[in-house]
From Swiss-Prot:
Its biological purpose: May be involved in transcriptional regulation.
Molecular function GO labels: DNA binding; zinc ion binding
Record-annotated KRAB domain positions: 135-196
Name of protein: Zinc finger protein 394
Domain SCAN box: 38-133
Tissue expression per record: Expressed at high level in testis.
Protein location: Nucleus
Zinc finger (C2H2-type): 327-349, 355-377, 383-405, 411-432, 438-460, 466-488, 494-516
Cellular component, GO annotation: nucleus
Length: 521
């Protein structure tokens, strides 16, 4: 295609970072040939968003696309399967429904399997969400652990006020044209005119109405209830428009006692016995039981449990009104929910690699990457396929392998009897037929696989895209670079099991083993 248009794609190394081939190499800022390492995600966005009007002409547009695509997919570093993984992940995120897409992208999945798991988790939560304009205690309480209640109880009335300030009052789907107002929802919990006994009967049945008749809305209830905790949940279908419904779930003990003294025999004192503090243990005057974090529901059979999936939608809605990612990176403005995640991310910019392998001296920016690397020395393969028993060093390799069982298609070679997968059958049969369909245009040499032809062509072009970050020496093959790097690190991964001597290259080990064979003979 490029030849027909008169545009020759830039060499593989042009405009790219030259990096040491290892699992976390994007963190090597200093290895950039141009001195400014660019995040692959940034290059992906630039690749997708490039407009013809931004460049001088068709040749420059094509050249720019080549450059951005290679910075994004990094063919000098990633394998074909890893590149396919990136492409499939991007397309998967693109075709997701809008409500799922935003949630999954926010979690920055690194693989298709991780993205699918996130989408499935949120889909379950959305499927189980009530489509009506009511929220039950069972829907909220049963789905959360005590630890999650603890997190939600930290919310403040301000969240609800901010969420409804711009829209004013919000129509609740399924409740005719009645409206929801923050003060109205809060006041219904303690107002004397609200017929508390009837209200508590509805609470005991597990149903909290979204709107109750209320008194004067001009009173400053925020001062009276400074520690009121509010839950928010999306209600209604996407077509009708979703609505955030606030629900009071905690009132401070001091405010409750104060209100009880003022009301004496009013229904608010009864209600105060059932909605207690979100900051500690509270004793209910009717049953005398201590309830963790002070949450007491009249129906004692309603207890939180550990089903997190059905609460994901609720938690995500709450996060939308919070500062979701308070820890910001000064270099790229990326946000994180936890400080530890920010520290890990910053190593990409600083190039810091605090984790070192004791066997070969190789360093890593993440402890998880070191653990994976160490398995190359120990031979450990902790991930076993339940179908065939084959073991793998990494979970992603197991996931990739398990796809082959989804459509089991294995064939027996008639020539040698070897069992091969359908994807490898034609390649295997070329061994017997002596077929070499890929021919070099310079020297007429033929190859069985296209990748072998590409590697060979570098001997003619002189292209050496793989550079050693220690001494600057360049190589045409990544495998040759890896072997060379062992001269700097001192790594000797190949061990003779007879005498224990170690070697940098497998060929050296084979040559050494002949010594033992000759001595035996």
């Amino acid at each position: 295609m490029a030849a027909g248009s008169g545009v020759v794609p830039p060499p593989l190394g042009a405009g790219l970072c030259t990096v040491k081939v290892e699992e976390d190499s994007p963190g090597n800022q200093e290895s950039s040939g141009s001195g400014d390492w660019q995040n692959p995600e940034t290059s992906r966005k630039q690749f997708r968003q490039l407009r013809y009007q931004e460049v001088a002409g068709p040749e420059e547009a094509l050249s720019r696309l080549w450059e951005l695509c290679r910075r994004w997919l990094r063919p000098e570093l990633l394998s074909k399967e890893q590149i396919m993984e990136l492409l499939v992940l991007e397309q998967f995120l693109t075709i997701l429904p809008q409500e799922l897409q935003a949630y999954v992208r926010d979690h920055s999945p690194e693989s298709g399997e991780e993205a699918a798991a996130l989408a499935r988790t949120l889909q379950r939560a959305l499927d189980r969400a009530s489509p009506q304009g009511f929220m039950t205690f069972k829907d909220v309480a049963e789905s959360l652990t005590w630890e999650e209640w603890e997190q939600l109880a930290a919310a403040r009335k301000g969240f609800c006020e901010e969420s409804t300030k711009d829209a004013g009052s919000t129509v609740v789907p399924g409740l005719e044209t009645r409206t929801v107002n923050t003060d109205v929802i809060l006041k219904q919990e303690i107002l004397k005119e609200a017929e508390p006994q009837a209200w508590l009967q509805e609470v005991s049945q597990g149903m909290v109405p979204a709107l109750t008749k209320c008194g004067d809305p001009s009173e400053d209830w925020e001062e009276k209830l400074p520690k009121a905790a509010v839950l928010l949940q999306l209600q209604g279908s996407e077509e009708q428009g979703r609505t955030a419904i606030p629900l009071l779930i905690g009132v401070s003990r001091e405010e409750r006692d104060s209100k009880n003294n003022e009301s004496e025999n009013s229904g608010s004192s009864v209600l105060g016995q059932h909605i207690q503090t979100a900051e500690g243990l509270g004793t209910n005057s009717q049953c005398g039981d201590d309830h963790k974090q002070g949450f007491h529901v009249k129906c004692h059979s309603v207890k939180p449990h550990s089903s997190v999936d059905s609460a994901v939608g609720l938690l995500e809605t709450q996060r939308q009104f919070q500062e979701d990612k308070p820890y910001k990176c000064d270099s790229c403005e990326k946000g994180f929910r936890q400080r530890s995640d920010l520290f890990k991310h910053q190593r990409i910019h600083t190039g810091e690699k605090p984790y070192q392998c004791q066997e070969c001296g190789k360093r890593f920016s993440q402890s998880a990457a070191l653990v994976k690397h160490q398995r190359t020395h120990t031979g450990e393969k902790p991930y076993a396929c339940p179908e065939c028993g084959e073991c793998f060093r990494q979970s992603s390799h197991l996931s990739r392998h398990q796809r082959t069982h989804a459509s089991e298609k294995y064939y027996k070679c008639e020539e040698c009897g070897e069992i091969v997968h359908v994807s490898s059958l034609f390649r295997h049969q070329r061994l017997h037929r002596g077929e070499r369909p890929y021919k070099c245009g310079d020297c007429e040499k033929s190859f069985r696989q296209r990748s072998d032809l590409f590697k060979h062509q570098r001997t003619h072009t002189g292209e050496k895209p793989y550079a050693c970050v220690v001494c600057g020496r360049r190589f045409s093959q990544s495998a040759t670079l890896i072997k060379h790097q062992r001269t700097h690190t001192g790594e000797k991964p190949y061990k003779c099991f007879q005498c224990g001597e170690r070697f940098r290259q497998s060929t050296h080990l084979v040559r050494h083993q002949r010594i033992h064979q000759n001595s035996v003979s």
